[in-house]
Protein backbone atom coordinates (compact mmCIF):
# COMPACT_ATOMS: atom_id res chain seq x y z
CA UNK A 1 0.00 0.00 0.00
CA UNK A 2 2.87 2.34 0.92
CA UNK A 3 4.53 1.66 -2.47
CA UNK A 4 1.32 2.48 -4.34
CA UNK A 5 0.96 5.77 -2.45
CA UNK A 6 4.59 6.59 -3.26
CA UNK A 7 4.08 5.85 -6.96
CA UNK A 8 0.86 7.90 -7.07
CA UNK A 9 2.74 10.77 -5.49
CA UNK A 10 5.53 10.53 -8.06
CA UNK A 11 3.06 10.39 -10.97
CA UNK A 12 1.31 13.52 -9.77
CA UNK A 13 4.52 15.48 -10.41
CA UNK A 14 4.61 16.71 -14.00
CA UNK A 15 8.41 16.14 -14.29
CA UNK A 16 7.97 12.39 -13.61
CA UNK A 17 5.27 12.10 -16.27
CA UNK A 18 7.47 13.95 -18.77
CA UNK A 19 10.49 11.69 -18.09
CA UNK A 20 8.38 8.55 -18.50
CA UNK A 21 6.63 9.65 -21.69
CA UNK A 22 9.25 11.70 -23.53
CA UNK A 23 12.67 10.15 -22.82
CA UNK A 24 14.16 7.82 -25.42
CA UNK A 25 14.88 4.23 -24.49
CA UNK A 26 18.63 3.89 -24.38
CA UNK A 27 19.09 1.16 -21.85
CA UNK A 28 21.32 -1.51 -23.38
CA UNK A 29 19.36 -4.44 -21.89
CA UNK A 30 16.11 -3.18 -23.44
CA UNK A 31 17.70 -2.50 -26.81
CA UNK A 32 19.22 -6.00 -26.74
CA UNK A 33 15.86 -7.57 -25.88
CA UNK A 34 14.14 -6.05 -28.89
CA UNK A 35 16.96 -6.30 -31.43
CA UNK A 36 18.70 -9.61 -30.80
CA UNK A 37 17.69 -12.50 -33.04
CA UNK A 38 15.43 -12.40 -36.06
CA UNK A 39 12.30 -13.38 -34.13
CA UNK A 40 9.83 -10.47 -33.84
CA UNK A 41 9.31 -9.80 -30.10
CA UNK A 42 6.03 -7.88 -30.36
CA UNK A 43 4.37 -8.66 -33.71
CA UNK A 44 1.09 -6.84 -32.99
CA UNK A 45 2.85 -3.61 -32.05
CA UNK A 46 5.23 -3.93 -35.00
CA UNK A 47 2.30 -4.36 -37.39
CA UNK A 48 0.50 -1.33 -35.89
CA UNK A 49 3.37 1.09 -36.27
CA UNK A 50 4.39 -0.30 -39.66
CA UNK A 51 0.87 0.19 -41.03
CA UNK A 52 0.86 3.74 -39.69
CA UNK A 53 3.78 4.50 -42.03
CA UNK A 54 3.14 5.53 -45.61
CA UNK A 55 5.02 2.66 -47.29
CA UNK A 56 5.14 -0.33 -44.94
CA UNK A 57 5.51 -2.95 -47.72
CA UNK A 58 8.52 -3.68 -49.92
CA UNK A 59 8.15 -5.26 -53.35
CA UNK A 60 10.27 -6.32 -56.31
CA UNK A 61 11.18 -3.49 -58.74
CA UNK A 62 9.00 -5.11 -61.43
CA UNK A 63 5.94 -3.91 -59.50
CA UNK A 64 6.48 -0.39 -60.93
CA UNK A 65 5.73 -1.71 -64.43
CA UNK A 66 2.58 -3.51 -63.28
CA UNK A 67 0.98 -0.92 -60.99
CA UNK A 68 0.47 2.82 -61.77
CA UNK A 69 2.23 5.33 -59.54
CA UNK A 70 -1.13 6.80 -58.48
CA UNK A 71 -4.64 5.37 -58.20
CA UNK A 72 -7.91 6.93 -59.51
CA UNK A 73 -8.11 9.16 -56.41
CA UNK A 74 -4.60 10.43 -57.05
CA UNK A 75 -3.12 8.64 -54.02
CA UNK A 76 0.49 7.47 -54.37
CA UNK A 77 0.81 3.68 -54.58
CA UNK A 78 4.61 3.32 -54.52
CA UNK A 79 7.57 5.51 -53.65
CA UNK A 80 10.41 6.41 -55.98
CA UNK A 81 12.76 6.08 -53.02
CA UNK A 82 14.49 2.73 -52.70
CA UNK A 83 14.17 0.68 -49.55
CA UNK A 84 17.30 1.11 -47.43
CA UNK A 85 19.38 -2.04 -47.39
CA UNK A 86 17.79 -3.71 -50.44
CA UNK A 87 17.03 -2.92 -54.06
CA UNK A 88 13.29 -3.20 -53.52
CA UNK A 89 10.56 -0.59 -53.91
CA UNK A 90 8.57 0.77 -50.97
CA UNK A 91 4.85 0.22 -51.50
CA UNK A 92 1.66 1.60 -49.91
CA UNK A 93 -1.15 -0.71 -48.63
CA UNK A 94 -3.35 1.08 -51.20
CA UNK A 95 -1.39 -0.77 -53.90
CA UNK A 96 -2.77 -4.05 -52.59
CA UNK A 97 -6.32 -2.70 -52.91
CA UNK A 98 -5.57 -1.51 -56.46
CA UNK A 99 -4.13 -4.92 -57.40
CA UNK A 100 -7.11 -6.78 -55.96
CA UNK A 101 -9.52 -4.60 -57.96
CA UNK A 102 -7.61 -4.07 -61.20
CA UNK A 103 -4.81 -6.64 -61.29
CA UNK A 104 -4.68 -9.48 -63.81
CA UNK A 105 -7.03 -12.43 -63.30
CA UNK A 106 -5.13 -15.70 -63.34
CA UNK A 107 -6.47 -19.08 -64.34
CA UNK A 108 -8.40 -20.41 -61.33
CA UNK A 109 -8.56 -24.03 -62.51
CA UNK A 110 -5.98 -25.18 -59.94
CA UNK A 111 -7.59 -23.65 -56.86
CA UNK A 112 -10.26 -26.33 -56.25
CA UNK A 113 -7.57 -28.97 -56.80
CA UNK A 114 -5.06 -27.49 -54.35
CA UNK A 115 -7.60 -26.43 -51.74
CA UNK A 116 -9.57 -29.64 -52.27
CA UNK A 117 -9.99 -30.39 -48.55
CA UNK A 118 -11.52 -26.92 -47.96
CA UNK A 119 -13.86 -27.06 -50.96
CA UNK A 120 -15.06 -30.51 -49.88
CA UNK A 121 -15.63 -29.30 -46.31
CA UNK A 122 -17.83 -26.45 -47.59
CA UNK A 123 -19.86 -28.96 -49.62
CA UNK A 124 -20.28 -31.26 -46.60
CA UNK A 125 -21.46 -28.35 -44.43
CA UNK A 126 -23.80 -27.09 -47.18
CA UNK A 127 -25.48 -30.48 -47.44
CA UNK A 128 -25.31 -31.35 -43.74
CA UNK A 129 -28.33 -31.01 -41.47
CA UNK A 130 -28.15 -29.25 -38.13
CA UNK A 131 -30.92 -30.40 -35.80
CA UNK A 132 -32.20 -29.07 -32.49
CA UNK A 133 -29.99 -27.98 -29.59
CA UNK A 134 -30.38 -29.98 -26.35
CA UNK A 135 -29.23 -28.64 -23.01
CA UNK A 136 -27.80 -31.39 -20.78
CA UNK A 137 -24.66 -32.26 -18.89
CA UNK A 138 -22.10 -33.40 -21.46
CA UNK A 139 -19.88 -36.32 -20.50
CA UNK A 140 -16.87 -35.84 -22.71
CA UNK A 141 -13.99 -38.26 -22.96
CA UNK A 142 -10.67 -37.34 -24.47
CA UNK A 143 -10.09 -39.69 -27.38
CA UNK A 144 -7.55 -39.81 -30.15
CA UNK A 145 -9.51 -38.61 -33.17
CA UNK A 146 -8.84 -37.95 -36.83
CA UNK A 147 -9.07 -34.21 -37.53
CA UNK A 148 -8.68 -33.86 -41.31
CA UNK A 149 -11.38 -35.62 -43.33
CA UNK A 150 -10.67 -36.89 -46.81
CA UNK A 151 -7.00 -37.78 -46.41
CA UNK A 152 -5.10 -40.72 -47.85
CA UNK A 153 -3.32 -42.90 -45.29
CA UNK A 154 0.36 -42.33 -46.05
CA UNK A 155 3.00 -42.14 -43.33
CA UNK A 156 4.73 -38.77 -42.84
CA UNK A 157 7.86 -40.07 -44.63
CA UNK A 158 5.90 -41.51 -47.58
CA UNK A 159 3.96 -38.25 -47.95
CA UNK A 160 7.17 -36.21 -47.79
CA UNK A 161 8.61 -38.20 -50.71
CA UNK A 162 5.42 -37.78 -52.76
CA UNK A 163 5.31 -34.01 -52.06
CA UNK A 164 8.98 -33.54 -53.02
CA UNK A 165 8.43 -35.50 -56.23
CA UNK A 166 5.28 -33.53 -57.17
CA UNK A 167 6.22 -30.01 -56.07
CA UNK A 168 10.02 -29.98 -56.36
CA UNK A 169 10.80 -32.68 -58.97
CA UNK A 170 14.21 -31.18 -59.80
CA UNK A 171 15.47 -30.93 -56.21
CA UNK A 172 18.38 -33.18 -55.34
CA UNK A 173 17.79 -35.95 -52.79
CA UNK A 174 16.94 -39.62 -52.77
CA UNK A 175 13.21 -40.25 -53.04
CA UNK A 176 12.01 -43.82 -53.17
CA UNK A 177 8.37 -44.20 -54.11
CA UNK A 178 7.63 -47.82 -53.34
CA UNK A 179 4.02 -48.33 -52.30
CA UNK A 180 1.29 -48.51 -54.90
CA UNK A 181 -0.62 -45.64 -53.33
CA UNK A 182 2.50 -43.40 -53.45
CA UNK A 183 2.94 -44.02 -57.18
CA UNK A 184 -0.77 -43.54 -57.97
CA UNK A 185 -1.01 -40.29 -55.98
CA UNK A 186 2.23 -38.91 -57.50
CA UNK A 187 1.03 -39.59 -61.07
CA UNK A 188 -2.44 -38.13 -60.36
CA UNK A 189 -1.10 -34.96 -58.71
CA UNK A 190 1.53 -34.29 -61.38
CA UNK A 191 -1.19 -34.32 -64.03
CA UNK A 192 -3.55 -32.16 -61.93
CA UNK A 193 -0.92 -29.52 -61.18
CA UNK A 194 0.54 -28.90 -64.62
CA UNK A 195 1.17 -25.14 -65.15
CA UNK A 196 0.06 -24.39 -61.59
CA UNK A 197 0.95 -20.83 -60.54
CA UNK A 198 0.17 -21.21 -56.82
CA UNK A 199 3.26 -20.93 -54.61
CA UNK A 200 5.01 -24.31 -54.29
CA UNK A 201 5.18 -23.98 -50.50
CA UNK A 202 1.40 -23.56 -50.27
CA UNK A 203 0.91 -26.54 -52.60
CA UNK A 204 3.20 -28.60 -50.35
CA UNK A 205 1.21 -27.63 -47.22
CA UNK A 206 -2.10 -28.51 -48.85
CA UNK A 207 -0.80 -31.82 -50.17
CA UNK A 208 0.35 -32.74 -46.69
CA UNK A 209 -3.21 -32.16 -45.45
CA UNK A 210 -4.53 -34.45 -48.15
CA UNK A 211 -2.06 -37.28 -47.69
CA UNK A 212 -1.39 -37.67 -43.96
CA UNK A 213 -3.74 -38.57 -41.14
CA UNK A 214 -3.62 -35.92 -38.43
CA UNK A 215 -4.88 -36.92 -35.01
CA UNK A 216 -5.51 -34.99 -31.80
CA UNK A 217 -6.45 -36.06 -28.29
CA UNK A 218 -9.77 -34.19 -27.91
CA UNK A 219 -12.72 -34.29 -25.49
CA UNK A 220 -15.61 -35.84 -27.42
CA UNK A 221 -19.17 -36.88 -26.59
CA UNK A 222 -20.69 -38.74 -29.53
CA UNK A 223 -19.44 -39.40 -33.06
CA UNK A 224 -15.68 -39.75 -33.46
CA UNK A 225 -15.31 -40.10 -37.24
CA UNK A 226 -13.54 -37.18 -38.91
CA UNK A 227 -16.70 -35.68 -40.47
CA UNK A 228 -18.06 -35.15 -36.95
CA UNK A 229 -14.76 -33.93 -35.50
CA UNK A 230 -14.51 -31.11 -38.07
CA UNK A 231 -17.71 -29.61 -36.59
CA UNK A 232 -16.98 -30.43 -32.94
CA UNK A 233 -17.19 -26.74 -32.00
CA UNK A 234 -20.72 -26.60 -33.43
CA UNK A 235 -22.10 -29.81 -31.99
CA UNK A 236 -21.09 -29.90 -28.33
CA UNK A 237 -20.37 -27.48 -25.53
CA UNK A 238 -20.08 -27.93 -21.78
CA UNK A 239 -23.82 -28.10 -21.21
CA UNK A 240 -25.36 -28.36 -24.70
CA UNK A 241 -25.27 -30.47 -27.83
CA UNK A 242 -26.55 -29.85 -31.34
CA UNK A 243 -27.71 -32.74 -33.50
CA UNK A 244 -25.83 -32.93 -36.81
CA UNK A 245 -25.90 -35.22 -39.83
CA UNK A 246 -22.86 -34.82 -42.11
CA UNK A 247 -23.53 -33.85 -45.72
CA UNK A 248 -21.28 -36.54 -47.16
CA UNK A 249 -18.85 -39.32 -46.35
CA UNK A 250 -15.09 -39.24 -46.73
CA UNK A 251 -12.69 -41.90 -47.88
CA UNK A 252 -10.71 -42.22 -44.65
CA UNK A 253 -13.82 -42.89 -42.52
CA UNK A 254 -14.96 -45.48 -45.07
CA UNK A 255 -11.53 -47.12 -44.95
CA UNK A 256 -11.63 -47.24 -41.13
CA UNK A 257 -15.07 -48.87 -41.24
CA UNK A 258 -14.10 -51.33 -44.01
CA UNK A 259 -10.92 -52.22 -42.13
CA UNK A 260 -12.91 -53.16 -39.02
CA UNK A 261 -15.35 -55.30 -41.05
CA UNK A 262 -12.53 -57.02 -43.00
CA UNK A 263 -10.51 -57.69 -39.82
CA UNK A 264 -13.54 -59.20 -38.06
CA UNK A 265 -14.24 -61.54 -40.99
CA UNK A 266 -10.58 -62.58 -41.19
CA UNK A 267 -10.31 -63.25 -37.44
CA UNK A 268 -13.55 -65.26 -37.52
CA UNK A 269 -12.33 -67.42 -40.42
CA UNK A 270 -8.79 -67.82 -39.06
CA UNK A 271 -10.08 -68.97 -35.65
CA UNK A 272 -11.57 -72.15 -37.13
CA UNK A 273 -8.63 -73.05 -39.41
CA UNK A 274 -5.90 -75.59 -38.62
CA UNK A 275 -3.18 -72.91 -38.30
CA UNK A 276 -4.93 -69.69 -37.18
CA UNK A 277 -1.85 -67.44 -37.30
CA UNK A 278 -0.66 -68.52 -40.77
CA UNK A 279 -4.18 -68.35 -42.16
CA UNK A 280 -4.78 -64.88 -40.64
CA UNK A 281 -1.52 -63.51 -42.09
CA UNK A 282 -2.25 -65.02 -45.50
CA UNK A 283 -5.72 -63.41 -45.57
CA UNK A 284 -4.34 -60.00 -44.46
CA UNK A 285 -1.78 -60.12 -47.30
CA UNK A 286 -4.30 -61.12 -49.95
CA UNK A 287 -7.04 -58.63 -48.98
CA UNK A 288 -7.39 -55.16 -50.53
CA UNK A 289 -9.50 -52.27 -49.24
CA UNK A 290 -10.29 -49.55 -51.76
CA UNK A 291 -7.50 -50.80 -54.00
CA UNK A 292 -4.84 -50.70 -51.25
CA UNK A 293 -3.36 -53.80 -49.64
CA UNK A 294 -4.77 -54.41 -46.17
CA UNK A 295 -1.28 -54.92 -44.70
CA UNK A 296 -0.28 -51.40 -45.89
CA UNK A 297 -3.41 -49.94 -44.28
CA UNK A 298 -2.78 -51.81 -41.01
CA UNK A 299 0.73 -50.31 -40.82
CA UNK A 300 -0.61 -46.73 -40.99
CA UNK A 301 -4.12 -46.88 -39.58
CA UNK A 302 -4.46 -46.11 -35.83
CA UNK A 303 -8.01 -47.55 -35.50
CA UNK A 304 -8.31 -49.31 -32.14
CA UNK A 305 -10.68 -52.23 -32.40
CA UNK A 306 -10.34 -55.81 -31.19
CA UNK A 307 -10.16 -57.59 -34.56
CA UNK A 308 -7.93 -54.89 -36.06
CA UNK A 309 -5.60 -55.24 -33.06
CA UNK A 310 -5.43 -59.03 -33.55
CA UNK A 311 -4.36 -58.55 -37.19
CA UNK A 312 -1.79 -55.90 -36.20
CA UNK A 313 -0.38 -58.06 -33.42
CA UNK A 314 -0.09 -61.03 -35.80
CA UNK A 315 1.98 -58.81 -38.11
CA UNK A 316 4.20 -57.86 -35.17
CA UNK A 317 2.96 -54.24 -35.17
CA UNK A 318 2.60 -52.10 -32.07
CA UNK A 319 -0.86 -52.19 -30.50
CA UNK A 320 -2.39 -50.54 -27.49
CA UNK A 321 -3.09 -52.70 -24.45
CA UNK A 322 -6.84 -52.15 -24.44
CA UNK A 323 -9.58 -54.76 -24.62
CA UNK A 324 -13.35 -54.81 -24.68
CA UNK A 325 -15.81 -56.22 -22.18
CA UNK A 326 -19.52 -55.54 -21.89
CA UNK A 327 -19.43 -52.71 -24.42
CA UNK A 328 -16.65 -50.87 -22.57
CA UNK A 329 -13.05 -50.41 -23.63
CA UNK A 330 -10.75 -51.22 -20.70
CA UNK A 331 -7.24 -49.80 -20.60
CA UNK A 332 -4.89 -50.77 -17.82
CA UNK A 333 -3.21 -47.63 -16.50
CA UNK A 334 -1.12 -49.27 -13.77
CA UNK A 335 -0.49 -52.49 -11.87
CA UNK A 336 -0.21 -56.05 -13.14
CA UNK A 337 -1.73 -59.46 -12.62
CA UNK A 338 -1.25 -63.17 -13.26
CA UNK A 339 -4.02 -65.47 -14.46
CA UNK A 340 -5.08 -68.57 -12.56
CA UNK A 341 -8.01 -70.93 -13.15
CA UNK A 342 -10.39 -71.20 -10.22
CA UNK A 343 -13.69 -72.99 -9.67
CA UNK A 344 -16.43 -70.93 -8.01
CA UNK A 345 -19.98 -71.68 -6.88
CA UNK A 346 -22.87 -69.42 -7.92
CA UNK A 347 -25.85 -68.64 -5.68
CA UNK A 348 -27.60 -71.45 -7.56
CA UNK A 349 -24.75 -73.87 -6.65
CA UNK A 350 -23.67 -74.08 -10.29
CA UNK A 351 -19.88 -74.54 -10.70
CA UNK A 352 -18.09 -72.00 -12.90
CA UNK A 353 -14.48 -72.18 -14.04
CA UNK A 354 -13.18 -68.63 -14.21
CA UNK A 355 -9.75 -67.18 -14.91
CA UNK A 356 -8.94 -65.15 -11.83
CA UNK A 357 -6.58 -62.20 -12.12
CA UNK A 358 -4.31 -62.04 -9.12
CA UNK A 359 -2.76 -58.65 -8.37
CA UNK A 360 -3.59 -54.95 -8.05
CA UNK A 361 -4.64 -53.16 -11.24
CA UNK A 362 -6.14 -49.82 -12.29
CA UNK A 363 -8.22 -49.36 -15.43
CA UNK A 364 -10.08 -46.69 -17.33
CA UNK A 365 -13.40 -47.88 -18.74
CA UNK A 366 -14.78 -46.03 -21.73
CA UNK A 367 -18.24 -46.69 -23.14
CA UNK A 368 -20.54 -44.78 -25.48
CA UNK A 369 -22.55 -43.14 -22.70
CA UNK A 370 -20.47 -43.63 -19.56
CA UNK A 371 -16.86 -43.70 -18.41
CA UNK A 372 -15.21 -44.93 -15.23
CA UNK A 373 -11.98 -45.43 -13.31
CA UNK A 374 -11.69 -48.86 -11.69
CA UNK A 375 -9.18 -49.95 -9.05
CA UNK A 376 -9.23 -53.65 -8.19
CA UNK A 377 -7.26 -56.33 -6.37
CA UNK A 378 -7.62 -60.12 -6.60
CA UNK A 379 -11.38 -60.76 -6.78
CA UNK A 380 -12.05 -57.44 -5.03
CA UNK A 381 -13.31 -54.08 -6.24
CA UNK A 382 -11.44 -51.36 -4.33
CA UNK A 383 -12.86 -48.25 -5.99
CA UNK A 384 -15.08 -47.39 -8.94
CA UNK A 385 -15.62 -43.78 -10.00
CA UNK A 386 -18.34 -43.55 -12.67
CA UNK A 387 -19.51 -40.70 -14.84
CA UNK A 388 -22.46 -41.07 -17.22
CA UNK A 389 -25.22 -39.32 -19.13
CA UNK A 390 -28.09 -40.80 -17.17
CA UNK A 391 -29.07 -43.36 -14.53
CA UNK A 392 -29.28 -46.18 -17.10
CA UNK A 393 -25.76 -45.54 -18.48
CA UNK A 394 -24.29 -45.34 -14.96
CA UNK A 395 -26.01 -48.62 -13.98
CA UNK A 396 -24.56 -50.35 -17.10
CA UNK A 397 -21.03 -49.27 -16.17
CA UNK A 398 -21.45 -50.38 -12.53
CA UNK A 399 -22.71 -53.86 -13.58
CA UNK A 400 -19.77 -54.36 -15.98
CA UNK A 401 -17.23 -53.27 -13.33
CA UNK A 402 -18.78 -55.46 -10.61
CA UNK A 403 -18.70 -58.53 -12.88
CA UNK A 404 -15.16 -57.70 -14.01
CA UNK A 405 -14.02 -57.47 -10.36
CA UNK A 406 -14.89 -61.22 -9.98
CA UNK A 407 -15.96 -60.57 -6.35
CA UNK A 408 -17.52 -63.47 -4.48
CA UNK A 409 -20.65 -61.50 -3.54
CA UNK A 410 -21.29 -60.93 -7.29
CA UNK A 411 -21.03 -64.67 -8.06
CA UNK A 412 -23.23 -65.50 -5.07
CA UNK A 413 -25.88 -63.05 -6.36
CA UNK A 414 -26.62 -65.32 -9.36
CA UNK A 415 -30.18 -66.67 -9.25
CA UNK A 416 -31.11 -69.47 -11.68
CA UNK A 417 -28.96 -71.28 -14.24
CA UNK A 418 -26.45 -69.60 -16.53
CA UNK A 419 -26.93 -70.94 -20.03
CA UNK A 420 -26.53 -68.04 -22.44
CA UNK A 421 -25.38 -68.81 -26.00
CA UNK A 422 -24.00 -66.68 -28.81
CA UNK A 423 -25.39 -66.34 -32.36
CA UNK A 424 -23.67 -69.57 -33.40
CA UNK A 425 -25.44 -71.36 -30.51
CA UNK A 426 -22.18 -71.88 -28.58
CA UNK A 427 -22.17 -71.40 -24.80
CA UNK A 428 -20.61 -68.12 -23.75
CA UNK A 429 -17.56 -68.19 -21.49
CA UNK A 430 -18.28 -67.85 -17.72
CA UNK A 431 -17.46 -64.12 -17.49
CA UNK A 432 -19.87 -63.30 -20.30
CA UNK A 433 -22.48 -65.66 -18.79
CA UNK A 434 -22.30 -63.64 -15.56
CA UNK A 435 -22.45 -60.34 -17.44
CA UNK A 436 -25.54 -61.35 -19.44
CA UNK A 437 -27.25 -62.59 -16.28
CA UNK A 438 -26.82 -59.28 -14.42
CA UNK A 439 -27.55 -57.16 -17.49
CA UNK A 440 -31.00 -58.78 -17.50
CA UNK A 441 -31.58 -58.04 -13.80
CA UNK A 442 -29.06 -56.50 -11.40
CA UNK A 443 -31.36 -56.04 -8.40
CA UNK A 444 -29.87 -58.90 -6.32
CA UNK A 445 -26.32 -57.93 -7.31
CA UNK A 446 -26.79 -54.34 -6.08
CA UNK A 447 -28.62 -55.42 -2.89
CA UNK A 448 -25.90 -57.97 -2.00
CA UNK A 449 -23.04 -55.59 -2.71
CA UNK A 450 -23.33 -53.67 0.55
CA UNK A 451 -23.30 -49.94 1.35
CA UNK A 452 -20.95 -47.63 3.26
CA UNK A 453 -21.04 -44.05 4.62
CA UNK A 454 -19.17 -41.60 2.38
CA UNK A 455 -17.04 -38.49 2.84
CA UNK A 456 -18.09 -35.24 1.27
CA UNK A 457 -15.73 -34.88 -1.72
CA UNK A 458 -16.32 -32.05 -4.19
CA UNK A 459 -17.72 -33.22 -7.53
CA UNK A 460 -18.49 -36.71 -6.15
CA UNK A 461 -21.69 -38.25 -4.79
CA UNK A 462 -22.77 -41.72 -3.71
CA UNK A 463 -25.27 -44.08 -5.35
CA UNK A 464 -27.62 -46.47 -3.53
CA UNK A 465 -28.62 -50.01 -4.65
CA UNK A 466 -31.86 -48.64 -6.14
CA UNK A 467 -29.76 -46.23 -8.28
CA UNK A 468 -30.79 -43.09 -6.39
CA UNK A 469 -28.01 -40.58 -5.68
CA UNK A 470 -27.01 -39.86 -2.08
CA UNK A 471 -24.54 -37.57 -0.32
CA UNK A 472 -24.36 -39.75 2.81
CA UNK A 473 -24.23 -43.41 1.71
CA UNK A 474 -23.09 -45.33 -1.35
CA UNK A 475 -22.65 -48.88 -2.60
CA UNK A 476 -19.29 -50.11 -1.32
CA UNK A 477 -16.39 -48.56 -3.27
CA UNK A 478 -18.68 -46.93 -5.85
CA UNK A 479 -18.85 -43.16 -6.41
CA UNK A 480 -20.43 -40.99 -9.10
CA UNK A 481 -18.39 -38.15 -10.59
CA UNK A 482 -19.83 -35.08 -12.30
CA UNK A 483 -16.85 -34.92 -14.68
CA UNK A 484 -15.95 -37.36 -17.47
CA UNK A 485 -13.03 -39.75 -17.30
CA UNK A 486 -10.41 -39.51 -20.04
CA UNK A 487 -9.38 -42.36 -22.24
CA UNK A 488 -5.82 -43.31 -21.37
CA UNK A 489 -3.52 -42.63 -24.29
CA UNK A 490 -0.01 -43.64 -23.34
CA UNK A 491 0.07 -47.34 -22.45
CA UNK A 492 1.27 -49.02 -25.56
CA UNK A 493 3.14 -52.24 -25.86
CA UNK A 494 4.22 -54.76 -28.45
CA UNK A 495 2.45 -58.08 -28.21
CA UNK A 496 4.78 -60.99 -29.06
CA UNK A 497 3.69 -62.99 -32.10
CA UNK A 498 3.11 -66.36 -30.47
CA UNK A 499 0.60 -64.95 -28.04
CA UNK A 500 -1.10 -62.49 -30.36
CA UNK A 501 -4.29 -64.50 -30.78
CA UNK A 502 -4.98 -64.64 -27.07
CA UNK A 503 -3.33 -61.54 -25.68
CA UNK A 504 -4.84 -59.12 -28.10
CA UNK A 505 -8.42 -60.17 -28.30
CA UNK A 506 -9.30 -59.89 -24.62
CA UNK A 507 -6.42 -60.49 -22.27
CA UNK A 508 -8.62 -60.43 -19.19
CA UNK A 509 -11.38 -62.68 -20.38
CA UNK A 510 -10.05 -65.51 -22.52
From Swiss-Prot:
Keywords of this entry: Host cytoplasm, Host mitochondrion
Primary localisation category: host cell
Gene Ontology CC, one term: host cell mitochondrion
Signal peptide: none
Cellular compartments annotated: Host mitochondrion; Host cytoplasm, Host cytosol
Domain of life: Viruses
Keyword Acyltransferase in record: no
InterPro entries associated with the record: Flu_PB2_2nd, Flu_PB2_CAP-bd, Flu_PB2_middle, Flu_PB2_N, PB2_helical
Pfam families: Flu_PB2_1st, Flu_PB2_2nd, Flu_PB2_3rd, Flu_PB2_4th, Flu_PB2_5th
Function of the protein: May participate in the inhibition of type I interferon induction through inhibition of the host mitochondrial antiviral signaling protein MAVS. The knockout of PB2-S1 has no detectable effects on laboratory infected mice.
Protein name, per record: PB2-S1
Native species: Influenza A virus (strain A/Puerto Rico/8/1934 H1N1)
Lineage summary: Viruses, Riboviria, Orthornavirae, Negarnaviricota, Polyploviricotina
Amino acid sequence: MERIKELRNLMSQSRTREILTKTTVDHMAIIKKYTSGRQEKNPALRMKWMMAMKYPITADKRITEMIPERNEQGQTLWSKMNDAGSDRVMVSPLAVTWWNRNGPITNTVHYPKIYKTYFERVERLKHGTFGPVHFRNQVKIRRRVDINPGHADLSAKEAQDVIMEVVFPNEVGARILTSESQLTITKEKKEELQDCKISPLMVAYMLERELVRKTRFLPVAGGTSSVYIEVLHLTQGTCWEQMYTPGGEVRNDDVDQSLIIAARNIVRRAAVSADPLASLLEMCHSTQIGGIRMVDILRQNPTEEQAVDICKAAMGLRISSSFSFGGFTFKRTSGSSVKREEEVLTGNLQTLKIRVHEGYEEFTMVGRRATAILRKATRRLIQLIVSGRDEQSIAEAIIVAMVFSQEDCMIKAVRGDLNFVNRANQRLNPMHQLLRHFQKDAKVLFQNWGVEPIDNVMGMIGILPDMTPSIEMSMRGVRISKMGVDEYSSTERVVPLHQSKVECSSPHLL
